[in-house]
Amino acid sequence: MEAFLGTWKMEKSEGFDKIMERLGVDFVTRKMGNLVKPNLIVTDLGGGKYKMRSESTFKTTECSFKLGEKFKEVTPDSREVASLITVENGVMKHEQDDKTKVTYIERVVEGNELKATVKVDEVVCVRTYSKVA
């Protein structure tokens, strides 16, 4: 989990509009979502707890979690989901289930780059971040 800690600035996003569309996000929210480049901040809270915060001019969301334990999360598009985060072989796996669709996010750190691959059904998005702190 150590490799994921810090502040990450989004540099590139490919296919995010299709992910939002598949999740049923309305047109206006999709357009706003495509314009912003959020920072991702991952913090160790101690005692096996972590916080993941996504900050942008459009919206800020955060969740606190323990690896391997389910928790409730509100997504940036305001869906309430049951989430689970694990780390296996250097890959952070994040599952979000809103009871109609399941979103799978895999995050991998290579040097100062974090790559998040987002999948909903057969639709795939790749978001790339660079480490800033």
Curated annotation (Swiss-Prot):
Q: Which gene encodes it?
A: FABP1
Is the Transferase keyword given for this protein? no
Record note on domains: Forms a beta-barrel structure that accommodates hydrophobic ligands in its interior.
Keywords associated with the record: Acetylation, Lipid-binding, Transport
The protein's name = Fatty acid-binding protein homolog 1
Organism of derivation: Echinococcus granulosus
Which cysteine-cysteine pairs are annotated as disulfide bonds in the entry? none
Report the function annotation for this chain: Has been implicated in the acquisition, storage, and transport of lipids, and may be important to the organism since it is incapable of synthesizing most of its lipids de novo.
Picking any one GO molecular function of the record gives: lipid binding
Family statement: Belongs to the calycin superfamily. Fatty-acid binding protein (FABP) family.
Q: Which residues carry this modification: N-acetylmethionine?
A: M1
Q: Where does hexadecanoate bind?
A: R107, R127, T128, Y129
